[in-house]
């Protein structure tokens, strides 16, 4: 027990110190760690759908894209530049706070996840995988071509002039100076992503042994037996799709 506690403490210290060491070799190394943390969050969200509920979702990255575009639209002047009526209300763009974007990204992705799950409730295995793969490809094509007749996503060019993330007045897009020591912007992002990953791990850990988590695992092992035991498999599947997608949406917004 003492050995496990020591390992946890050493691991926590290593994770906290890692970006400070990496930034001495260049910000590119810290940026790799940033992206890795986002992929960890994506994997944890996907694990809810595939690992807990046993639903082979190959279009999961679509929720990542939706979260990214949501943040891009809400933290840039693109909508004001495209729609005159919108520009009259917000001449400089929305520039929405991260504290608002995160729950919105989670809700939007969860709604899309449930929307994807609804027509696939009776599909299993390879058939479910093919449908979800098609969904992911549809979203990619849709976003790439949503620049006409009304320019919403700016097509393959993407959205520009997106704000850096601000938290309680701290601009993560700028280096932070503490005395003679400077913490780079990418390192600040690292700690934000690390905090979100820890939150995701806690939620997933709590779900695993909860009533919902056990219901998902029962469906994964034998859906017919789970239904015979009184589990509402339809609602549980939709919940798995929605909850898993919400983590992908938040990761994309980052």
Regions inferred by a protein language model and the residue ranges of each:
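Transmembrane alpha-helices and adjacent helix-loop boundaries
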Residues: 1-254
């Amino acid at each position: 027990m003492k050995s496990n506690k020591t390992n946890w403490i050493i691991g926590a210290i290593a994770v906290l110190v890692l970006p400070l060491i990496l930034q001495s070799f260049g910000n590119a190394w810290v940026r790799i760690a940033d992206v890795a943390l986002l992929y960890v969050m994506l994997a944890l969200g996907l694990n809810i759908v595939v690992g807990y509920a046993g639903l082979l979702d190959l279009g999961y990255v679509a929720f990542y894209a939706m979260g990214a575009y949501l943040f891009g639209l809400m933290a840039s002047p693109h909508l004001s530049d495209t729609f005159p009526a919108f520009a009259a209300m917000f001449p400089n763009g929305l520039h929405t706070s991260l504290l608002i974007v995160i729950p919105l990204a989670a809700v939007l992705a969860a709604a899309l996840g449930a929307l994807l799950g609804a027509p696939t409730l009776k599909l299993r295995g390879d058939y479910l995988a093919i449908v979800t793969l098609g969904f992911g490809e549809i979203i990619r094509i849709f976003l790439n071509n949503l620049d006409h007749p009304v320019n919403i996503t700016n097509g393959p060019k993407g959205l520009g002039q997106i704000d850096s993330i601000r938290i309680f007045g701290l601009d993560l897009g700028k280096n932070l100076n503490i005395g003679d020591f400077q913490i780079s912007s990418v390192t600040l992002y690292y700690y934000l992503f690390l905090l979100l990953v820890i939150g995701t791990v806690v939620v997933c850990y709590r779900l695993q042994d909860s009533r919902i988590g056990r219901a998902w695992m029962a469906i994964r092992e034998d859906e017919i037996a789970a239904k015979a035991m009184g589990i509402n498999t339809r609602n549980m599947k939709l919940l798995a799709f929605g909850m898993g997608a919400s983590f992908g949406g938040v990761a994309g917004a980052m």
